[in-house]
Each structure stands twice: as C-alpha cells, then as structure tokens.
C-alpha cells in the first residue's frame, strides 16, 4: 500500500484475496491473473513533491509496473483493463475552469509517469486489441482518507487537525480551487468503465464542481493558519 492501509480492508475480510508482492517481479503475482475477467490497475506511488525527490522510484512503480501489468493482462486474455490515470497530466492550466481539450503538459515526475502509463494503455489497446480504458481522477476523498500528502488528501489532513484541536494549515491564501471527487463516485466510474464496450478511451472523472480550500475550512469550522507556498 503506497497511500492506504491494510486495516482499510478489514470490513471485507474473507471476501477478497490479498496478495503482497512486488509488481516488478512478475513471478510473485503472474498466476493471480488466471481466470480473471477485469483488471483495475490502481497501484502506484502518489503525490507530486515526493516524485521530484525520487523520480526513479516513481518511474519504476508507475511506468514499469504498468507495462508488466499490461503484459500480464494481454497474455491472460483479460476482458477489461481499467487504468487509474491522473488529472495532474494537465499541469498548470492557462484558464479556469479548464476545458477537457486543454493541452497535456505534465510538469512533475508523478504527472509525467501517470501520463506515460496512459500512453502505454493506449498502445496496448491499439496494437494488441486489449480492451482498455484510462480514467483521470480528480482529487479523490472520502471515508478512511489518508492524513498526509497534498491536494486530494487535504480532507484527511484537515480532519486529523480538527480531531487534534489544531488549526488548519492552509498553503497560500486558500483561494485555490480543486475539483474534489468522492470515493464512491470513483468506484461507480470504475465499474461503469469495466461494464462498457468502449476501448482505447480516456475519460475525466470529477464532480464538475470547484471548491476552494477556504470553503473546506468554512465547512469544517475552526481556525486556520496560512503558510507560504513551496
């Protein structure tokens, strides 16, 4: 788990099989693809800042691993392959709200690695006829959110600060906006993509609503401390 915890799955114990493995070592997991219909490739390292500090690790986990999973899916004749892409591939847009047709300009190793994953999926769909779709997630939040990181994790960070009776730490003036997407909507999108007959497509998955960080603070209630942008 790169951002989650094993304990998050306690409520489904006995209903799932958990395999601990390294995706770069296919021998550890390749057998698990037998008799599987759908593959949801959600495994990756997350967050932008750590990717700047560790680009090699991010490319190994987010690009190389995607290649291995695609190859395993192809050889196992998987019926549907769904890739978790990222809205970060758009980079810093020139206009807000940002049109879907905006240029793809990844500006950090994490964003670039996720975009390269999209391109791998497109290539496998075109060349090998692997039925595959990529979904670009926008700032996912919800139950059992992590309490560290940036962007989508801001809810978890703020909730942890609220429970500790600490002020919310707001980077900059707090007027920056994000499209936050609730986790159950993400799950619905994943299932819809798997049930669809579409292939070699990329879709944005968001709430179509922008919310400022200051608005989140207002909704949660409490004091805030503004800190400079990095």
Task: Locate the predicted segments by residue.
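N-terminal Rossmann/SDR dinucleotide-binding element
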Residues: 1-38
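Residue-level signal for the nucleotide or nucleotide-sugar donor/cofactor binding architecture
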Residues: 4, 24, 53, 61-64, ...
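C-terminal substrate-binding subdomain of Rossmann-fold SDR/epimerase-dehydratase oxidoreductases
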Residues: 21-24, 163-230
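NAD(P)H-binding glycine-rich loop region in Rossmannoid oxidoreductase-like domains
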Residues: 23-60
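Conserved mid-core alpha-helix of short-chain dehydrogenase/reductase
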Residues: 28, 67-72, 120, 180, ...
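SDR active-site strand-loop-helix element
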Residues: 39-45, 81-87, 135-137
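A conserved pocket-lining segment of Rossmann-fold NAD(P)-dependent short-chain dehydrogenase/reductase
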Residues: 50-51, 101-103, 132, 136-147, ...
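Catalytic helix-loop patch of NAD(P)-dependent Rossmann-fold dehydrogenases
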Residues: 53-68, 75, 79-80, 89-134, ...
């Amino acid at each position: 788990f790169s951002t989650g915890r094993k304990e998050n799955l306690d409520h489904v114990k006995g209903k799932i099989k958990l395999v601990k493995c390294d995706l770069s070592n296919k021998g550890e997991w390749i057998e698990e693809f037998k008799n599987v219909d759908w593959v949801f490739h959600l495994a990756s390292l997350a967050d932008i800042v750590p990717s700047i500090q560790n680009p090699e690790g991010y490319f190994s986990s987010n690009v190389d691993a995607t290649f291995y999973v695609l190859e395993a899916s192809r050889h196992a004749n998987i019926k549907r392959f769904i890739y978790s892409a990222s809205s970060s591939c758009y980079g810093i847009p020139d206009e807000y709200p940002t049109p879907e047709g905006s240029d793809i300009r990844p500006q950090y190793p994490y964003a670039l690695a996720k975009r390269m994953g999209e391109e791998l999926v497109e290539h496998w769909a075109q060349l090998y006829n692997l039925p595959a779709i990529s979904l670009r997630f926008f700032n996912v939040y919800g139950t059992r959110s992590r309490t560290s990181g940036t962007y989508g994790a801001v809810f978890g960070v703020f909730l942890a600060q609220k429970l500790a009776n600490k002020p919310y730490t707001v980077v900059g003036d707090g007027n920056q906006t994000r499209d936050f997407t609730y986790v159950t909507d993400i799950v619905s999108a994943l299932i819809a993509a798997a049930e669809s007959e579409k292939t070699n497509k990329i879709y944005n998955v968001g709430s179509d609503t922008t919310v400022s960080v200051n608005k989140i603070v207002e909704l949660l209630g409490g004091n805030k401390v503004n800190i400079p942008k990095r």
